[in-house]
Amino acid sequence: MDFSGKNFTAQQLEQLYRGILLPRMIEEKMLLLLRQGRISKWFSGIGQEAISAGVTLALEKDEWIMPLHRNLGVFTNRGLPLHKLFKQWQGARDGYSKGRERSFHFGTREHYICGMISHLGPQMAIADGVALAYKLRKENKVAVAFTGEGGTSEGDFHEALNVAAVWGLPVIFVVENNGYGLSTPVQEQYKCESIVDRAKGYGMEGVQIDGNNILAVYDTIKGVKEYCIEQQKPYLVECMTFRMRGHEEASGIKYVPDELFTVWEQKDPLKTFEHWLLKENMLTTIDIESAKTEFKNYIDTEIEMAFASQQTIVPVTKDEIADVYATWGQADTKYTVNVIGDVDNITQSSLVVHEKRFVDAISEAIYQSMIVHDNLIVMGQDIAEYGGAFKVTEGLVNKFGKERVRNTPLCESAIVGTALGLSLEGYKSVIEMQFADFVTAGFTQIVNNLAKIHYRWGQNADVVIRMPTGAGVGAGPFHSQSNEAWFVHTPGLKVVYPSSAVEAKGLLIAAINDPNPVLFFEHKALYRSVSGQVPEEPYEIPIGKARCIEEGEDISIITYGAGVHWALEYAGKHTNTSFDILDLRTLSPLDYEAIAASVSRTGRVLVLHEDTLTGGIGAEIAAWIQEHCFTLLDAPVMRCASLDTPVPFNIELEKNFLAKARLDECIQRLLNY
């Protein structure tokens, strides 16, 4: 291994040696503790330490890194105390994630490390978002994302690199190519000669280096960082290396030929570097033994400290639930905003109001929020000059420019990941899904990254995803789905679904102000068919509060979205029945108090929604009412929903599919029970 030709000072060489030595010695200690039965599992990175150490030491301490589960050297070289790291690995309350995350999945804002999720690929787009924040603020920084050669097979790898290239983002993508994805060899993973060859396809530069040579890693990253900042472009670095242990200790290494171990043992990144330092008289044997003694004492002391203070976690359920969402209040916003609870009397208020369509109310909410929040970025396919598929964002790019109103490539997953990266740097994002149906392409980012990150390590995800949804417009099975129930079932997300123009504006402003991830559903059929009196100035309607549109005595219809208009239309034609119509407005969290109040007024409940019947939110509401309001009921809670089929294209088939076609039948059954 050639360590020559690098212009390093003695101090730098010692720092790099110590940077690779400490994680190796910690790993060896962990393997000993594993054999002793004092810890239960370990994911080893022995043989790959030069990459983590070299990359981290080449960066400034306030540049974000997105590491994986073998990058111990990232954490040690960022100065995380070992006793707290060990507590994290042991699932202790006073680790970095209160016992909620295993091993290296946690993050820490203090050290500019964003923890991974097990899916690997989604990690990379978060670096895009961080780099976009750097670019917008004109900061001379880079973001770094790690992945393995296995992770490059995921679509998220393609999406992250493509977005970084198209937008000119200063991201360094580091691929640790250790030859095996768990046990799958590279010849079963990809067919190109080298992963770095893919860089050309994205119009970016790339380089393949010896990942076991810490000087090569450090020197390369230093140079690449300079290039990324100066050129405002991404870079792909493929580091060739080898993992000397199994995927985790229980899985073993039988799948690796013995001769490979023989070859790579001669390339051990610590031993070869140590040998060169001694040979070149950069360090003495005494220096090396002194460093090892220092680290051994440090490791033993820190681990015993962690063991001595380890206590069994006593779960406090209310704390677990409370940490799912970030807390907030009006004090967190930059302006004093009206909070409107009673939209029925809005015309009698002191606010100046005008008649607006549903679509225009949403546009105004975004426009006013962008004025108030100069850190708000709007992203989506065709949303800039074209104004979006439904023209919601029309004109915004003329006012705020293309830096803040950004057309995206067709890559939903990467854009959601980018939004999370922006959130790490204090930005807000509004993403437009062209159709709610297309959100499936970003599902992992939403339900595993956005939804879980605050519970995991206290980082909020300040992201609103706008979801044009619903049928009734003859758009067929892939442009008409009602998929809100998918997200209601996911802790950590808020789900909002307005039915009127005044609520669309107020709820969207509230969603943008909220530091938590919000799925904001907008029924396409309401965009230009529904209008109402809407205040000119910004205002919020509280998330999590339902609205009783009509009070009645005979039957409660609990609904939302287009269902509100179906219910009102039906009630208007059947004046002999007294209807209590409750517009939920927010599906997560639900307003259980309002639901119970409606039940108490009538004793008969129909839950109406456009979503299909089985597994819809109506089942959840019905179950809650049966559990908590059973004595108030005069009949079973009934559901009226769309057919359990895909949404058909033909207009007559679509009418038959929709819940509205069965509304009269359901109401009559309930009244006659």
Regions picked out by a protein language model, each given a short descriptive name:
Residues 1-51, 245, 249-400, 625, ...:
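Conserved acidic/glycine
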Residues 32-38, 103-117, 141-146, 179, ...:
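Glycine/charged-rich beta-loop-alpha catalytic/anionic-binding loops adjacent to active sites
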Residues 41-48, 69-70, 106-124, 148, ...:
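Active-site nucleophile and cofactor-binding loops and adjacent substrate-binding regions
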Residues 112-308, 488-603, 607-608:
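Glycine-rich ThDP/TPP pyrophosphate-binding loop and its adjacent helix/strand module
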